[in-house]
Amino acid sequence: MNEHNPIYGVNPNPTPSNDTFDFVMPDIPEPPQNEKPEPKDRDSVGFKFGFIGAGQGGGKLAETFSQIGYARVGVINTADQDLATINVPNKMKFGEQQGAGKNREFAKQAFLNSKEDVVDFIKSSIGTDIDRIFVTVGAGGGTGAGVCSELVKTVKEYQNTIKAGSPYVGLILALPKLSEGKKVSQNAYETLKEACELVEQKIVSPLIILDNERINSLYPKLSVNKFWQVANANICSLFHLFNNIITKNSQYSTFDTNDFRTVLDSGIMVFGAANIINVSSESEISKAVRENLKRNVLCGELDLSTGSTAAAVAICDEKTLDSIPQEYLDNAFNQLNRTLKTNSTVHQGVYKGVKEGLSIFTAIGGIATPVDKLDALLKASQ
């Protein structure tokens, strides 16, 4: 007699022996494999960048890149409350407690305990069609400062696994104001020191430092809301301009993908911008380049004279292009070259735009470790 089994069905040839287990394999339905499409950035860009923000400050930076139009963005944090304030589609809470309480070691251990989950999150948020991933952190807190080095190394491993376009991991580090207290300054000192070591080890490039103390001194009357908007908009907008401009053609002088890659691969990096509405003399352009460097809100206490490579892009409306001699721009670019160390390289680009006047955007790379800034943070922590 054939017995019916609700799982295996009916065996048409039952065996009388108890020594053999013969059965019909059940048909087990498998869930459909829905492949997630690769993210697509909103604007035309030369490089496919991804951004993983850690902590509240790093999360806000990553959110700003998302608002600009970058699609490969994810944010991790030890606190649900902080994640709730970040408007990005990909967010992950790690660790068993809520927040790190400015404790770098606590955040680091929580990250290590969740490392494989974070790798899965990176893959889900960033995908595999990527040139370089940037880690964004605030150096003064607990979560971002605590996980910074380990997150960078994890991203490096992930990039190697998927054969990303670059061997380097980008790092954007927001330094706190010195008035935020000794513990915050201590966290920032340790995090910046580790970040510079990662640059020396050829793991991180570029390292972009956003110095909130510098912003505070340049814009002392900014409201609380506008302060963070200015801080994040400066770095994100300038960064995007260079990544976007390398996709544009120019009949004058083109700043291309390889030019930008050279600066990105040079280590510590800083951006600047200057606008001139009415260009009446050569000295105006040269002065704009100088002021561009002096008033750079991202610079802090970096020694730009140690820079080894730079990009300088001039964008003018048609009227300005018709009126200023080429010699004016050449001399301005040469002045930038003289600002850097001997045998440096300045990659140039000249483009026609719609905004009235002349705008000059700069990116300087290969800058030496900011010893003065490290000393200032160490002193503030004592």
Annotate the PLM regions.
Residues 2-382:
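Tubulin/FtsZ superfamily GTPase core signature
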